[in-house]
């Protein structure tokens, strides 16, 4: 439970700060809770992105020292590497070509559709303007994956991306819109029975978190250390 709570504090705090664009504070939050590991997980991603705006050489150094992980981690590392190379005025085209090939050749794991879509859109947006063939391949693959998964969230992510909508065929854009509509996204409410069940689950989780925080305060420092190990 304590390890779980440490992860929640680390992840939710980081997500809140980065969503607000407060990257320096997000990095300080992660460092305070010892959340920067050797693999390209949330903490290390934030550290690289925080460095990009001021000292991209530090971001590049973090990438170089990153321990390879699962395929999706390596893809994220590749995207951040491209961003660092561009910030340092270096060539990123060969790396972008590899990212496109790897994305098209490997299908997403179960439960990773939205993440996979965001990854694909990131690669698409990083492509140079003259990489038109690669960009059209990415758009076609993103459209195909959202359609096969019948995932409205994935379709909505695609529609929110300007480069996707500017390159996609009209029928692809329309298909994505129909999928979002079919999945009832943006309707503004939940049926009352579902809302009641969700409220009950959230209330129970709130009680568990408050009880855990109250019991763990006297030994907080030891908790953080053990959670990191």
Which stretches of residues belong to each language-model region?
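Central/C-terminal regulatory/activation regions of fungal transcription factors
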Residues: 36-39, 47-57
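Alpha-helical protein-protein interaction scaffolds
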Residues: 9, 13-31
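Long, charge-rich C-terminal accessory regions
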Residues: 53-179
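Structural signature of alpha-solenoid helical repeat junctions
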Residues: 2-5, 39, 113-115, 190, ...
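Short, flexible helix-coil linker/hinge segments at the edges of structured domains or between repeats
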Residues: 1-8, 27-35, 40
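C-terminal functional modules
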Residues: 142-229
């Amino acid at each position: 439970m304590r390890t779980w709570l440490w992860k929640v504090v680390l992840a939710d705090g980081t997500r809140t700060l980065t969503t607000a664009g407060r990257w320096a504070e997000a990095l300080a939050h992660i460092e305070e809770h010892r959340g920067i590991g050797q693999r390209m997980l949330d903490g290390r991603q934030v550290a690289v992105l925080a460095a990009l705006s001021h000292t991209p050489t530090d971001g590049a150094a973090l990438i170089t020292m990153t321990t390879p992980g699962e395929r999706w981690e390596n893809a994220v590392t590749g995207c951040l590497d491209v961003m660092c190379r561009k910030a340092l005025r270096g060539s990123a085209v060969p790396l972008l070509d590899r990212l496109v090939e790897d994305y098209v050749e490997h299908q997403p794991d179960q439960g990773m559709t939205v993440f996979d879509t965001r990854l694909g859109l990131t690669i698409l947006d990083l492509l140079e303007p003259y990489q038109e063939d690669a960009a059209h391949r990415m758009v076609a693959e993103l459209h195909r994956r959202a359609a096969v998964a019948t995932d409205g969230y994935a379709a909505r992510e695609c529609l929110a991306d300007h480069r996707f909508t500017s390159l996609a065929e009209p029928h692809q854009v329309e298909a994505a819109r129909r999928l979002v509509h079919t999945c009832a996204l943006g309707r503004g409410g939940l049926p009352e029975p579902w809302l009641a069940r969700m409220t009950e689950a959230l209330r129970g989780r709130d009680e568990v978190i408050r009880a855990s925080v109250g019991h763990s305060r006297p030994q907080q420092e030891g908790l953080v250390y053990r959670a990191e190990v």
